[in-house]
């Protein structure tokens, strides 16, 4: 099972995070043979625009808040969260902090200037993706969503996580093999088993192609777990 972040991992910031067609084709080919999940902090409305034509096995969106798997869709929050979120939105409004409401999370773009104010929030958890912040329930993360996904699938095989930023740390914590793209933050590279020599989607694409085309490389990856 491969679990890949999207922004600056499958997609390139220079392309406004629209995934390259060549990357789409390889991911779709890979997903026809192996389990492949996109695990992103992005909201659904943006993925519909940025990932056109991409057909992975499934999705984990909003930083672990929602799992989408074939005909199943699971929100990993209860109704209490929405009352908390409403109050948090009022606090952000009062402080003049612009935000986007997802189906679960509150997303604050370019939030680093508000870090001191955001750090005072006690009712929720803040996770960072470079300079952007995601406000979410304390029990929600990419890693927790992957645990639930594996339970749903009764999956006991090897898990490979690919990422670049702070909010991928929880994803890496539940993976057998941790892979950083070449443009990953230093702290992500430091905890990775493999650092790719290419950036963003091209790096992921080459990695997937190697698994598809080189049986000995796949065996080597499986050996990481032993």
From Swiss-Prot:
Named cofactor requirement(s): Mg(2+)
Recorded catalytic activity of this chain's protein: 2-phosphoglycolate + H2O = glycolate + phosphate
EC assignment: 3.1.3.18
Keywords, in A-Z order: Carbohydrate metabolism, Hydrolase, Magnesium, Metal-binding
Top EC group: hydrolase
GO function term, MF aspect, one: magnesium ion binding
Active site: 5
Positions of Mg(2+) binding: 5, 7, 164, 168
GO cellular component terms given for this protein: cytosol
Role of this protein: Catalyzes the dephosphorylation of 2-phosphoglycolate.
Family of the protein in this entry: Belongs to the archaeal SPP-like hydrolase family.
Name of the protein in its database record: Phosphoglycolate phosphatase
Species this protein is from: Sulfurisphaera tokodaii (strain DSM 16993 / JCM 10545 / NBRC 100140 / 7)
Organism taxonomic ancestry: Archaea, Thermoproteota, Thermoprotei, Sulfolobales, Sulfolobaceae
């Amino acid at each position: 099972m491969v679990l890949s972040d999207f922004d600056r991992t499958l997609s390139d910031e220079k392309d406004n995070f629209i995934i390259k067609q060549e990357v789409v084709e390889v991911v779709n080919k890979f997903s026809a043979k192996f389990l492949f999940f996109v695990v992103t902090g992005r909201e659904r409305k943006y993925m519909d625009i940025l990932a056109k034509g991409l057909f992975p096995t499934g999705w984990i969106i909003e930083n672990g808040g929602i799992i989408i798997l074939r005909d199943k869709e699971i929100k990993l929050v209860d109704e209490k969260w929405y009352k908390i979120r409403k109050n948090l939105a009022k606090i952000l409004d009062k402080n003049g902090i612009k935000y986007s409401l997802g189906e679960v999370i509150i997303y604050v773009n370019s939030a680093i200037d508000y870090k001191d104010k955001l750090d005072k929030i006690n009712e929720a958890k803040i996770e960072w993706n470079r300079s952007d912040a995601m406000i979410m329930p304390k029990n929600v993360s990419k890693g927790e969503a992957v645990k639930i996904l594996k339970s749903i699938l009764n999956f006991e095989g090897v898990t490979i996580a690919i990422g670049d930023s702070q909010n991928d740390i929880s994803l890496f914590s539940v993976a057998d093999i941790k892979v950083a793209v070449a443009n990953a933050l230093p702290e992500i590279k430091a905890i990775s088993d493999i650092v790719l020599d290419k950036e963003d989607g091209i790096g992921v694409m080459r990695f997937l192609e190697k698994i598809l085309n080189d049986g000995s490389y796949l065996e080597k990856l499986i050996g990481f777990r032993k």
